[in-house]
Amino acid sequence: MRAILPLLLAVSLPLAAAPLHSQFLPPDDQALRQEAPTAQQLLQVTDYSVVVGAQRQSDQQPIPITASLQMRLKGKPLSKGATIGQVLLTFDGEAGKSLKKPVYDDKTRTLSLNYPVSDYRVIMDLLRNETVYVQFLTYANGHVWADLHTGTVRTR
């Protein structure tokens, strides 16, 4: 057993260096995630709320009316050192258009993500039927990654 223990430890070190839930990352075709992430926020979603709003700013002419679709996800942080408390999803724009990059605010413990409106139904379906996780990774080269994903689900 003493001879096997160091071998098991050596084999597990590369696994320990990888962030939790790294198996859910897409292939790194552009080699942006070669180094270990400098920070990870991982949240298991336990509650959500949806806000569909309309706004009219009366001091502007012509008077524009804007509408927004937002979702607030709350849950429990899972990764070591994670401080995340909530995720604010804003749905705007169209698929294929450039969206704002993911941003984590340490002060408010809020991760802000932007998705095209076309992703709303997919995300609602996940929230209604699966355990959902939100992951945010930052890298020393300035690259950031954020996603919503389920755990591994067995087919029925």
Where is each model-derived feature located?
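Positively charged n-region of N-terminal signal peptides that target proteins for export
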Residues: 1-4
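Bacterial N-terminal signal peptides
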Residues: 6-14
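Acidic, glycine-rich flexible loop segments
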Residues: 98-151
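Short, solvent-exposed mixed-charge patches
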Residues: 154-156
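OB-fold ssDNA-binding interfaces and closely related basic DNA-contact patches used
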Residues: 18-84
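A structural detector for beta-sheet-dominated domains
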Residues: 46, 51-53, 70-74, 90-92, ...
